[in-house]
Amino acid sequence: MGIKYLPVSVASTALSFVGLQVWTELSLDRLRADGLIAKNISLGDSEHALELLLGSYFTIALLTNFVLNVYILLVLSLKTLFFGDLYDVETKKLVERLANYIIYKGTFLPLVIPPTIFQGVLWTVWLTVLCTLKMFQALARDRLERLNASPSSTPWTYFRVYSVLFLVLSVDMFWIKLSLMTYNTIGSAVYLLLLFEPCSIAFETLQALLIHGFQLLDMWINHLAVKNSDCQRSKFIDSMTAGSLLEWKGLLNRNLGFFLDMATLVMALGHYLHIWWLHGIAFHLVDAVLFLNIRALLSAILKRIKGYIKLRIALGALHAALPDATSEELRAYDDECAICREPMAKAKRLHCNHLFHLGCLRSWLDQGLNEVYSCPTCRKPLFVGRTENEVNPRTVEVSSDEQLARQLERQNNPVHALATGLFPAEVPDSVENDTSRNLGLDPSWLQTWSSQGSDVAGPSTTSRTVGLGRVQMMMRHLASVGESYAQTALDDAAWSLWPMNPSQASTSSTTVPPGNGGRTGGLHLRTVSNTTNESLTNILAMAETVREVMPHVPDEIIFQDLQRTNSVAVTVNNLLQM
């Protein structure tokens, strides 16, 4: 599908048009010679002449060939205009996705469609249009992701690819209108199937427009600031937009993205439910496949809802842990964020009265080592007046961690492998019986803001007994999940019969670098003493961090996931989807 195919497509389309025209003239001359039509065809005789022409299979073949060539020419022209040459990875992914879509969406249509020529042509055109829309949507999303990661991309290049999403949405809305008119005209329940997939594509396209629209806006603002650095109007625009762009981006991506994500899943579920209702239950193999697909979609919907609820709880905890700066403070300081050097429409205030964007502060705390978190400006500790036990309330569990380390070491030694499991059975009653663990929050979090509510920020001089590890890890999780939640929700699941397991989607997109001591890939603990001790130390430290954020998750599940992923962020992502 490279640019070199475009001249070939133009020549093929021209030849097919000439061949169709020549054959039509010869057919009309033969019909005139037989006396079936008059020499001068009037408007009233045109319908009869067209019926006679379409009575020939060769005419239908030439017409089909011409339409197919026009379609290929149109696709290649749009591809050349918006994308240029495709990368090898894009071409490979495109072929795989289209094959999956045709198999999983077109296979079930013969079960409910009457075997007539009209029905065959109608549903073939329907599937072709949907495949084309999905193809351009997927190409646009993949290319936008590549441009977003490229430092040399310009706003114009980004907008050229971004406009493909508007084209897809416009054609899809027009197709939905035609499908609705067809259903209203014929009135058969079969034609409701014309609506589910176009609506699903519309929701997916709106989701992509939302996510990449913020990226385009951010790129345009940065480009404008660099180009017109001395222009007062540019500075005014920056002060009005840059400060609140991050807040609006996270809010809309999280809430509106979740709604569009759920709408896409519901449309896919409705498509298969309607096919099952039209086909009936006959206890055949196809019924089992439909049932498994419906079950997987229902499971994905429930997991998405549970993940969104957990994310909302985490956001409330984070906003309570770090108080918001008031409008009076923002006007009094009239400062910009010391991390991103952008104006602040909303900010979080530390106890030292320095203000920062929540996202910037989240990234700063993500760099903290050994729970030594300081203000980016004055380097004062973020939370003062706290004892060592308050900073790390789980240090009393060192004995259990030592037991875990010893059992992990035995497990990695084939001579001392344990058949009964990896983790100790002894768990403190105070941890297991704490009801607040069922909510995913530690009691030390709840005690400090239960009387204020999650959105009320205390004074800057008030010290809060908030676990720094929990704040840091919660910020890391919200950075990796909250902002990209809507974007990665249906990237590959919408193409397959069964949606991808969220844990598989997370781990498959994460590359774990080789560790020290010859470890490659995932976490493989060796029997060598130095490597084993280092690996045990790392996994215990990561388990402690995950345990601070999600104390309600059993230790066994945390350690098993960490051994598979060797990443705290990926493990938190996986546990949130449970």
From Swiss-Prot:
It is found in: Membrane. Induction: Repressed upon infection with the P.syringae avirulent DC3000 strains containing avrRpm1 or avrRpt2 (at protein level). Pathway: Protein modification; protein ubiquitination. The keyword DNA repair does not apply. The chain crosses the membrane at residues 6-26, 58-78, 111-131, 161-181, 186-206, 272-292. It comes from the Eukaryota. It is a multi-pass membrane protein. Disruption phenotype: No visible phenotype. InterPro entries: CUE, RIN3_plant_CUE, Znf_RING, Znf_RING/FYVE/PHD. It catalyses: S-ubiquitinyl-[E2 ubiquitin-conjugating enzyme]-L-cysteine + [acceptor protein]-L-lysine = [E2 ubiquitin-conjugating enzyme]-L-cysteine + N(6)-ubiquitinyl-[acceptor protein]-L-lysine. Residues 538-578 form the CUE domain. It is an enzyme of class 2 (transferase). GO terms for cellular component: plasma membrane. One of its GO terms (biological process) is positive regulation of plant-type hypersensitive response. The keyword Transmembrane applies. Residues 504-524 are annotated as: Disordered. Residues 504-513 have a biased composition (Polar residues). A zinc finger (RING-type) spans 337-379. Changing residue 337 to A: Loss of E3 ubiquitin ligase activity. One of its GO terms (molecular function) is ubiquitin-protein transferase activity. Interacts (via C-terminus) with RPM1 (via N-terminus). This is E3 ubiquitin protein ligase RIN2. It comes from Arabidopsis thaliana (Mouse-ear cress).
